[in-house]
């Protein structure tokens, strides 16, 4: 109803930027464009790669901001980090591991990524209702029984949250 959704499963933000954000859909005539990428990069790469994870995060965010700005696109904040007890299917592993870095390290990277984009560009904040009392992504909002993905019924466009939180 007035919008479309293009899910690009298994695509990292880094991979999307290398390919070019404008390559993901026919955007001619699109009035409003929004992107959500980055959780795979936090889960598997930013705490694993050589160098300072925060500097690596900022470099990735700068590339994201540059391409989003060129397209006049909005950026959604990253999902919170779920508890490490979540059993992740092997398709969600990288080099045999469900994640790289501790929960606290990945949360720090995720929070910095969101804050940095908000400071340098703009970001759509929408995930507070997805948190449990420990500040983790609550399993209740994730695909069942085991997945690293948010259940579609909790996507912003399904719930109307995006219109309430846009600045």
Question: What residue spans do the PLM features occupy?
Answer:
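Serine-esterase "nucleophile elbow" of acetyl-processing enzymes
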Residues: 1-30, 118
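Alpha-helical cap/lid subdomain in secreted, periplasmic
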Residues: 21-152, 160-163
